[in-house]
A protein has these predicted regions:
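Divalent metal-dependent catalytic cores for phosphoryl transfer on phosphate-bearing substrates
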Residues: 25-26, 36, 49-164
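Short hinge/gating elements
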Residues: 21-30, 181-184
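Short alpha-helical hairpin
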Residues: 4-22
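Non-transmembrane, amphipathic alpha-helical segments
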Residues: 29-32, 117, 190
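Terminal helices and disordered tails flanking the catalytic cores of nucleotide-processing hydrolases
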Residues: 133-219
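Amphipathic, well-packed alpha-helical segments that form the structural scaffold of globular domains
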Residues: 21, 41-45, 88
């Protein structure tokens, strides 16, 4: 069976992730390289493992997380759909089980807030993992005077935590924000759609979604 480690160590996949990120660098986007996809993979796995999903489902979620942004190699627009098609070809060539390919492709094709929906548990975990990866280290632009709103919001986040409570009824995204660089309103201006999708994803997993910024509950 194909494992997460197999995918992480695949030279072709690493090339696609690197080149996709290079395209986003050219367009001024935040980091979407190995750091981001690894965080997303591990977080998606954490969510399903914590909720008691089978070990293989957890592994499939991690694979989906690692591959979820390769569509940026084609174009940022519709990257979830192009990424799903790329993932299908890659996984098929690696003799991945068709049932697992179907789950991974569906999750990748539904992870973006523009058209995505948490259609299965892996898709839901991927959405929550991806949208919660907000952090200062993703900002590449070091000239604070030229920051756009995306730079300001990501740079302002000193710490980000996504945790499920012990009762497995609640998933909470806690952000520590330095308002010197970005306001809470800035966050909502660019992330409102993402937070709505996170709420839907949490509900798919039988959870409530809560957002806390600087210890204040906002959702």
């Amino acid at each position: 069976m194909l494992t997460f480690e197999d995918v992480k160590n695949n030279a072709a996949i690493r090339t696609y992730i690197q080149r996709a990120d290079e395209s986003l660098i050219a367009r001024g986007f935040t980091e979407h390289s190995y750091a981001h996809v690894t965080v997303v993979a591990e977080t998606a796995g954490y969510i399903l493992e914590t909720l008691g999903y089978p070990e293989r489902t957890v592994e499939v979620a991690k694979i989906a997380g690692y591959l979820h942004d390769i569509g940026n190699l084609v174009n940022r627009i519709d990257h979830s759909q192009s990424g799903a098609v790329m993932a299908f070809r890659i996984l098929d060539n690696l003799d991945c089980d068709p049932e697992e390919i179907a789950t991974i492709v569906t999750a990748i094709g539904n992870h973006d807030e523009g058209t995505g929906q948490p259609v299965n548990a892996v898709a839901a975990a991927l959405i929550l993992a991806d949208k919660s990866d907000v952090r200062r280290s993703r900002v590449r632009n070091q000239d604070l005077s030229s920051f756009d709103i995306h730079d300001r919001v990501n740079y302002s986040v000193k710490k980000s935590q996504l945790k499920i409570n012990e009762e497995h009824t609640l998933i909470k995204l806690k952000l520590s924000v330095d308002t010197k660089y970005g306001s809470v309103m800035d966050y909502f201006e660019i992330f409102m759609q993402r937070m709505i999708l996170c709420r839907k994803a949490a509900e798919k997993l039988g959870l409530q979604f809560k957002l806390m910024i600087n210890e204040q509950q906002l959702i």
